[in-house]
Curated annotation (Swiss-Prot):
Region Required for binding to single-stranded DNA, residue ranges: 1-360
Subcellular localization, as worded in the UniProt entry: Nucleus; Cell junction, Desmosome; Cell junction; Cytoplasm
Annotated protein name in UniProt: Plakophilin-2
ARM repeats: 341-383, 385-424, 427-467, 571-616, 671-711, 719-758, 763-804, 807-849
Chain positions with Omega-N-methylarginine modification: 46
Low complexity bias spans: 286-297
Keyword Phosphoprotein recorded: yes
Consequence of substituting residue 87 to A: Reduces phosphorylation of S-82 by MARK3. Reduces interaction with MARK3
Pfam families, sorted: Arm (PF00514)
Length: 881
């Protein structure tokens, strides 16, 4: 099976594999010399057998050298370089690296004997010193054959490292030369092929045990310019870097917190702590700590010594003091000897809350130790209300707040994470933070730190999980509705409690009703000046302005905090309206998202909810300088002979007509601050969001803001109503909201129509656009749920407004078949009085007032007693609408 070689290789026999398999190869095997060459050697005075013997020795040396450099471990299967790559691709040789499972090809660049060899691949680039005196033929010139070898099972003397897709690189320590076996051990890379992998660990007894891992992401730590992934088994060389180094600006523990923060089955609203899960050998010289981004470990190496961890179900393992100090904070130590015995105490003692709180002493502990203790507290308070209470009893909150002054990013980040879990759903801890002057301390850190992770710890949860985990919008909390006397508007105020996946430290504090006014007093100005105004781009006109110190998540988190604060009450609303730049920035940001065709932006939802709350009772709470201008004509209205007009006094129809005849105050072309709240630009902005956004809470807040602005009968509500209906054609958008699936949006839309229908000049237009829709949403029977009762009552009052002064509108209501529904609901008032039944009774009484329709009623088989009876008369005369 010999094949003639190329001229440069004349005299050598080609491989015994046939051409049908290998084709035209460009390299030769290390076969024996040809007979012709042996004859030539014999004629030159050298014995052929001697040449043959030397050639065999040379062949064996080169084969062993190439085998040592090129083999790659894959479990128990090793691949040598005796078979060309494409032979594997022909599936003639079965191997784990064939086909789609093959990793990125590695390139080898070997210089002369004793020089450094570099290797690179998907996992990074590394160097090693080789003592081989033979150079490797470059792959571009030769394709050496490959052989398959089956190696024995893994043993404690030979550890395999499993790596994630993150970069892997390793450098030998100064003065160390990696020979063949050491370099092979350092280069054993197993590419992750499954989400679940079994990692071979070494127990104290020398036996192997397996640990199941449910996450392919592994933590990565920085050391100089080299990025090493964390080892999943004991390192082959204990002298190599194992521990974190202090002073690193950011740890992968915090970066990967973003990847694993929101996982299925977790209690919402908390920070996933950064806690090491690792087996630990009793040999301190070889003890290592490696961190994993997942806490889903089903089994630890019990033989390896005590450790502590908590998986997703809350089950405890053990964490030693030494482990917490080595890796709990996520910031690495270059030397284990950094800790003295007096500092560590017994490193194998189990870490407890008591011990962790006692370690929070800035004057006596290294920053890395403090970070480890704070991280442990953060971890223990995750899903454990008892741990939160215990830390409070140990005065741990005070110690954590005092540590905020430490000028160390890692300490500040760990402390903020611990505080964030401590205040989650624990009002006592929230009040404790406030009483200990914690809010100003947090704001000081927020202003001074340049670390984005710390800012996010203070304002909200981790960053990027929103897209990965379907980040839900902030849930609006509808407070008990308050009715403004004589205004006909039922206004709800939006707020956000401790929400799933939205639970920053300040956000959680602002969810406590007792702390909202405190937050407004201490945090409003700082958050507005340092976050809201810079990011929104106002007043420069840019949108938005993310930079190295701010990003969208921080802006979103702060708007969520302000959203809670805006529901504090009258004093809080007034303070927020007076805050320079707040309303301007919010309006500027929302207008920018609409212009960029992003009406579903989740920060826009928060901004609109804030504006919605600030428009609540606006007419009554306006500063005197605005009310004097708006109501100047209102006070000049006089009635003839000072007599009260109508049975309802100042709320009668004739007085409303006089209000509507009063000229409206001129609108400022350049509004500022609170003036934006009723400006036509903002009204148009709300209508755009109603029409374009698909987020229910954005729609509800926009409708609610217009509802608040149109509540009442003064110049401002009348002007806003006319703008909505006549100038901006807003009825078409409001009408569509009557048919959405969300009942809260539907209820708010009907409440807005009810306010609009109080304007006499708009009633016919409203009836023309919406009367059939109003009838369609009225149920056939008495509603049972509170929300449906409110919706039905508002629909009946709206119909009552538009039929009172119009015979034609009343006839249209009769023709649509709505009277039968109304009578059925009114009848329910006899046995279960509610708002809907009362509103239906009022509407029936008003319908009978149109005498010209009596014949039509009788023709439709209705009697007078269906419209006028003791029930309907009582409801009508008790009406204070």
């Amino acid at each position: 099976m010999a094949a003639p070689g190329a001229p440069a290789e004349y005299g050598y026999i080609r491989t015994v594999l046939g051409q049908q398999i290998l084709g035209q190869l460009d390299s030769s095997s290390l076969a024996l010399p040809s007979e012709a060459k042996l004859k030539l050697a014999g004629s030159s005075g050298r014995g052929g057998q001697t040449v043959k013997s030397l050639r065999i020795q040379e062949q064996v040396q080169q084969t062993l050298a190439r085998k040592g450099r090129s083999s790659v471990g894959n479990g128990n299967l090793h691949r040598t370089s005796s078979v060309p790559e494409y032979v594997y691709n022909l599936h003639l040789v079965e191997n784990d690296f064939v086909g789609g499972r093959s990793p990125v090809p590695k390139t080898y660049d070997m210089l002369k004997a004793g020089t450094t060899a570099t290797y690179e691949g998907r996992w990074g680039r590394g160097t090693a010193q080789y003592s081989s005196q033979k150079s490797v033929e470059e792959r571009s010139l030769r394709h050496p054959l490959r052989r398959l070898e089956i190696s024995p099972d893994s043993s404690p003397e030979r550890a395999h490292y499993t790596h994630s897709d993150y970069q892997y690189s390793q450098r030998s320590q100064a003065g160390h030369t990696l020979h063949h076996q050491e370099s092979r051990r350092a280069a054993l890379l197993v590419p992750p092929r499954y989400a679940r992998s079994e990692i071979v660990g070494v127990s104290r007894a020398g036996t192997t045990s397996r640990q199941r891992h449910f996450d392919t992401y592994h933590r990565q730590y920085q050391h100089g310019s080299v990025s090493d992934t964390v080892f999943d088994s004991i390192p082959a060389n204990p002298a190599l870097l194992t521990y974190p180094r202090p002073g690193t600006s950011r740890s992968m523990g915090n970066l990967l917190e973003k990847e694993n923060y929101l996982t299925a089955g977790l209690t919402v609203g908390q920070v996933r702590p950064l806690v090491p899960l690792q087996p630990v050998t009793q040999n301190r010289a070889s003890r290592s700590s490696w961190h994993q981004s997942s806490f889903h470990s089903t089994r630890t190496l019990r033989e390896a010594g005590p450790s502590v961890a908590v998986d997703s179900s809350g089950r405890r393992a053990h964490l030693t003091v030494g482990q917490a100090a080595a890796g709990g904070s996520g910031n690495l130590l270059t030397e284990r000897s950094t800790f003295t015995d007096s500092q560590l105490g017994n490193a194998d003692m189990e870490m407890t809350l008591e011990r962790a709180v006692s370690m929070l002493e800035a004057d006596h502990m290294l920053p890395s130790r403090i970070s480890a203790a704070a991280t442990f507290i953060q971890h223990e308070c995750f899903q454990k209300s008892e741990a939160r209470k215990r830390v409070n009893q140990l005065r741990g909150i005070l110690k954590l707040l005092q540590l905020l002054k430490v000028q160390n990013e890692d300490v500040q980040r760990a402390v903020c994470g611990a505080l964030r879990n401590l205040v989650f759903e624990d009002n006592d801890n929230k009040l404790e933070v406030a009483e200990l002057n914690g809010v100003p301390r947090l704001l000081q850190v927020l202003k001074q730190t340049r670390d984005l992770e710390t800012k996010k710890q203070i304002t909200d949860h981790t960053v990027n999980l929103r897209s990965r985990n379907g980040w839900p919008g902030a849930v609006a909390h509808a407070c008990n509705p308050s009715t403004l006397g004589g205004q006909g508007g039922r206004i709800t105020r939006s707020g956000v409690r401790d929400q799933p996946d939205q639970h920053g430290l300040l956000w959680n504090l602002s969810s406590n009703d007792k702390l909202k006014n405190l937050m407004i007093t201490e945090a409003l100005l700082t958050l507005t000046e340092n976050i809201i105004i810079p990011f929104s781009g106002w007043p420069e006109g840019d949108y938005p302005k993310a930079n190295g110190l701010l990003d969208f998540d921080i802006f979103y988190n702060v708007t969520g905090c302000l959203r809670n604060m805006s529901s504090a009450g009258a004093d809080g609303r007034k303070a927020m309206r007076r805050c320079d730049g707040l309303i301007d920035s919010l309006v500027h940001y929302v207008r920018g998202t609409i212009a960029d065709y992003q009406p579903d932006d989740k920060a826009t939802e928060n901004c609109v909810c804030i504006l919605h709350n600030l428009s609540y009772q606006l007419e009554a709470e306006l500063p005197e300088k605005y009310s004097q201008n708006i109501y100047i004509q209102n006070r000049n209205i006089q009635t003839d002979n000072n007599k009260s007009i109508g049975c309802f006094g100042s709320r009668s129809r004739k007085v409303k007509e006089q209000y509507q005849d009063v000229p409206m105050p001129e609108e400022k072309s350049n509004p500022k601050g609170v003036e934006w709240l009723w400006h036509s630009i903002v009204i148009r902005m709300y209508l755009s969001l109603i029409a374009k956004s698909v987020r229910n809470y954005t729609q509800e807040a926009s409708l609610g803001a217009l509802q608040n602005l149109t509540a009442g009968s003064g110049p401002m509500p009348t002007s806003v109503a006319q703008t909505v209906v006549q100038k901006e054609s807003g009825l078409q958008h409001t009408r569509k909201m009557l048919h959405v699936g969300d009942p809260s949006v539907k209820k708010t839309a009907i409440s807005l129509l009810r306010n609009l229908s109080r304007n006499l000049s708009l009633q016919n237009e409203i009836a023309k656009e919406t009367l059939p829709d109003l009838v369609s949403i009225i149920p056939d029977t008495v509603p049972s749920t509170d929300l449906l009762i409110e919706t039905t009552a508002s629909a009946c009052y709206t119909l009552n407004n538009i039929i009172q002064n119009s015979y034609q509108n009343a006839r249209d209501l009769l023709n649509t078949g709505g009277i039968q529904k109304i009578m059925a609901i009114s009848a329910g008032d006899a046995y279960a009085s509610n708002k809907a039944s009362k509103a239906a009774s009022v509407l029936l009484y008003s319908l009978w007032a149109h005498t010209e329709l009596h014949h039509a009623y009788k023709k439709a088989q209705f009697k007078k007693t269906d419209f006028v009876n003791s029930r309907t008369a009582k409801a009508y005369h008790s009406l204070k609408d």
